[in-house]
Each structure stands twice: as structure tokens, then as C-alpha cells.
């Protein structure tokens, strides 16, 4: 049982204020040079003994795939701000000319979300995310337990979150999961993300526990351009026929990420992904992200 106060809303407001304060002071090079063949896929400007969570991983530039989490680490006291934007226009309804007259969904409003993420301690990050869908707040933690290297073939992160609708006042949905990734040189990242979500269908009061296994990948096709895709099939629980999926093209510019994506739904939290996508639907959207470390 959760005890709800206004502290959650106050905390999120302070967090968003903090990111804009950080932005005013942040200075960062506009681009990252392409590594030579002798350079490793993971690079760092840190001196020995400093927090290696700040190392640049060329195959994994962002904390999200599209909607699923990645295994990217956040250094202690570092932060990140991200905006998710999913337009309301369904590109699979109407003719090409009709969609074009609505600028392919841009004229039909959007579901917008904002996330602030902070490095609480070494290998540990916390985030607060708010999306317009059902006015949902999600509070989120990730512990990066294993990093791929000579002694480990995979990176593994533990995930925990709780989300609530109507500004975190009802329909609470806690979630537990792990994110597992495998980097292939500095060109390819593969992901498997099993997540258990409770109370997925609070309104319907049915199939309250759901397990899904998200699968994703990111391919670096040039120095700073990536192709990204994910699918989120459900293993058990809430069971509409359509699994959520999406694909995207992504551009990295220094500490900034811009991703233009297409999804068969507008959900971005664990609970929303567990409810699946929408049949015969495709929505244009984008993610914008900025790192401060």
C-alpha cells in the first residue's frame, strides 16, 4: 500500500528546475571524434580512479532504446534530461494525402513526457518521469550491476519503478526487471529486458500481473547516426493481441540525442508498454535527450 502525499509532485518540480539550472552552467564539446581502429569502443576522459560511469560508449549513446531502458551508466552527481513526444495522428488511418494535410500527425496534438535522471551513487541512478497519458508519474531506479568487459560478456542492470495515474494519485503499478545488453565492437548493441508489472489493468480489474520481455537493438551506421528498433511481446498476464513495437533513426551530437521514431502505440512507461500496442496503428514521434556530465 502506498502513502501518497504532495511530496512526489514537489520533488518532480524541483528536479525539472534543477536540470534547467544545470543547463545554464554546462559546457560541452559539440561532437565526439570517431575512434581509430586502435581505440576501444568505450572511451573516457577520466583519470585513473575517477568514476568510470562517465565513459562514452559509442554503441550505446542514450538511456533509452526507444521506450525500453538501456544499460548506459550515469556517473555520480551526473544528470540527464529527456523529452518524449508521440503525436496523436495514426498514420495508418486515411490516405497519404489526408495524412499529409495534417502534416503526418503534427497537427493533431501529442502525448508529451519529461524525464529528469540523476546519478545518486556509483552505478546507481534514479529518475522521475511524467507523461501526459493518464497524467502518469513514474519514479524509477536502476542499478548497473555488471558491465561488459574482459571478465563479463554482458552488461546487466536491475530495474525498479512505480507509476501512478492522475498525477500519482491512483492506479499504481509497481514494476521489477532487468536490462541485459551485449555490445559488438562499437557498432551494435543488443538488448533483452524482462519486466514484471503489477496492476496493469487497474480500470478493468483483470490480469493484474504481466510479464513482458522487451527485445531491442541499435546499429551505428556512421560516426553519429544510429538505426534503432524494439518489440515488447508479453509472456503472461494482460493479453491484447498486439505487442508494442517501434523503430527509429537517431543522431548523436555531443551530449545531445535526437531520435525520430515510429511506434504502434504512445505508451512510454513499463505499465503502458505492458498493455501493448494498438492494432493497425503507427504514430510518429521523437525523443530529445541532453546529458550533463
State what each model feature region is.
Residues 28-167, 171-176, 181-201, 219-222, ...:
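Transmembrane beta-barrel domains of Gram-negative outer membranes and organellar outer membranes
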Residues 11-21:
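Bacterial N-terminal signal peptides
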Residues 1-2, 28:
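Short, intrinsically disordered, low-complexity terminal/loop segments
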Residues 205-220:
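A contiguous pocket-lining binding segment that forms or flanks enzyme active sites
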Residues 23-26:
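Boundary at the C-terminal end of the N-terminal hydrophobic targeting segment
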Residues 2-12:
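Bacterial N-terminal signal peptides that target proteins for export
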Amino acid at each position: 500500500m502506498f502513502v501518497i502525499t504532495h511530496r512526489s509532485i514537489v520533488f518532480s518540480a524541483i528536479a525539472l528546475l534543477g536540470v534547467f539550472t544545470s543547463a545554464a552552467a554546462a559546457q560541452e564539446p559539440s561532437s565526439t571524434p570517431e575512434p581509430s581502429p586502435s581505440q576501444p569502443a568505450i572511451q573516457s576522459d577520466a583519470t585513473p580512479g575517477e568514476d568510470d560511469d562517465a565513459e562514452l560508449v559509442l554503441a550505446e549513446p542514450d538511456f533509452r532504446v526507444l521506450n525500453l531502458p538501456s544499460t548506459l551508466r550515469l556517473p555520480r552527481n551526473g544528470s540527464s534530461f529527456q523529452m518524449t513526444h508521440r503525436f496523436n495522428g495514426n498514420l495508418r488511418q486515411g490516405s497519404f494525402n489526408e495524412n499529409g494535410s495534417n502534416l503526418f500527425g503534427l497537427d493533431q496534438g501529442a502525448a508529451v513526457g519529461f524525464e529528469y535522471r540523476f546519478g545518486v551513487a556509483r552505478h546507481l541512478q534514479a529518475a522521475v518521469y511524467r507523461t501526459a497519458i493518464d497524467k502518469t508519474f513514474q519514479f524509477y531506479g536502476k542499478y548497473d550491476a555488471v558491465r561488459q568487459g574482459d571478465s563479463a560478456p554482458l552488461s546487466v542492470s536491475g530495474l525498479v519503478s512505480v507509476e501512478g495515474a492522475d498525477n500519482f494519485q491512483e492506479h499504481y503499478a509497481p514494476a521489477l526487471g532487468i536490462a541485459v545488453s551485449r555490445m559488438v565492437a562499437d557498432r551494435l548493441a543488443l538488448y533483452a529486458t524482462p519486466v514484471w508489472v503489477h496492476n496493469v489493468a487497474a480500470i478493468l480489474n483483470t490480469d493484474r500481473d504481466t510479464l513482458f520481455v522487451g527485445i531491442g537493438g541499435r546499429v551505428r551506421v556512421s560516426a553519429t547516426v544510429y538505426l534503432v528498433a524494439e518489440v515488447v511481446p508479453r509472456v503472461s498476464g494482460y493479453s491484447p493481441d498486439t505487442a508494442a513495437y517501434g523503430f527509429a533513426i537517431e543522431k548523436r551530437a555531443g551530449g545531445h540525442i535526437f531520435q525520430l521514431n515510429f511506434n504502434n502505440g504512445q505508451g512510454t512507461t513499463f505499465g503502458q508498454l505492458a498493455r501493448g500496442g494498438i492494432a493497425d496503428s503507427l504514430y510518429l514521434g521523437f525523443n530529445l535527450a541532453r546529458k550533463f556530465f
